[in-house]
Amino acid sequence: MSYCKQEGKDCIIFVTKEDHEAPSNAELVEDDPNDPYEDHGLILPNGDINWNCPCLGGMASGPCGQQFKDAFSCFHYSKEEIKGSDCVENFRGMQECMQKYPELYPQEDDNDSAPSGGANTAPTDSLPASSTDSTAAAATENPATS
């Protein structure tokens, strides 16, 4: 006998072997050619925000989705001379939420713009002279053998 167990927002469906082996009777729904969310960008023709836009990268869903929607909506509809200046509290709320989930919303470091060698790679011209001299000397004293 199949049954569903609700755990928070998730519904876990348990099926028997017989249910699993039986042919599916699910009906596939064709895409609606009049779907107002289909083939549009971030802003719908009526000026509303398209929360289904892949350009949002899933930010509108997830644990901080509502905070993101509140902040983004506030900014989008802001009439202030400095657009969004009335939305500071919304963005703070979103930031506080995101800090609770660092694995989902990693912080960007200032070192993200470091050269491709990585943040810990220092150019040789910034090393003390004795350091570069000893490195060069070591390279000439112990040539690599093939």
Curated annotation (Swiss-Prot):
Renumbered ranges of motif Cx9C motif 1: 64-74
Stretches assigned to the CHCH domain: 61-105
UniProt feature, compositional bias: Low complexity: 123-140
Organism: Danio rerio (Zebrafish)
The protein's name in its UniProt record: Mitochondrial intermembrane space import and assembly protein 40
GO terms for biological process, alphabetical: mitochondrial disulfide relay system; mitochondrial respiratory chain complex assembly; protein import into mitochondrial intermembrane space
Any GO MF annotation of the entry: protein-disulfide reductase activity
Signal sequence range: none
